[in-house]
Amino acid sequence: MKFMLLTLGIVLQLLSFSQDTIIDRGIYQSYYSYSLQQPMYVKYVLWKGGGECSRSKFRFINDTELAMVDNSEYTRSGFDRGHLANAEDFAYDCVKDELTFRYYNCLPQTPNLNRGPWKVWETTIRQESQKDSLLIITGGIWTGTVEKGIQVPTYCWKVVQSLSTLKVTHVLLFTNKINDSVGKEITLAELEKMLKYQVPIRKKKIIKTKK
């Protein structure tokens, strides 16, 4: 099936993959695809993100028995290990921060995306988390592009929902190409049409009861 993304003016063959397992690390959940050997998306809650933890000694690892794209594929591939649950969001706690350095929490991103508009939006959303608790869901869309043995997402996306109002505040779509890393705001309906599945935003507020 083809879907024309009018905001970018491109027609591409969008591929469907299934989420096969959920890797729960407490601070985030990775919805992992065996066929991709990558996460389809990652979900986490952010409240007052940021901090002073030094990440200079942290390295990406695979601490599961699952086969996944890892250091052997990334080395000299030209792609960054693009965090989905952002490391700096958890820099208030080095133990939590280190947990973001997992291969089931990253996608191959071009350097100009990972260090450009992706990073800019990570900073913007972290600033917004100082005033509101946010649900962040972020992942990729694949069209069959294979670079040096890695299935590379053609797009990366990010959805942000306010947990105080349940309003979806951002739906972001980024092209993941060497010379093109445009970020666009689109609608949730447009994104879900591309994904072929519903983004798992929260439908009801969680009411905390006193013990």
Residue locations for each model-derived region?
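Hydrophobic h-region of N-terminal signal peptides that target proteins for export
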Residues: 4-17
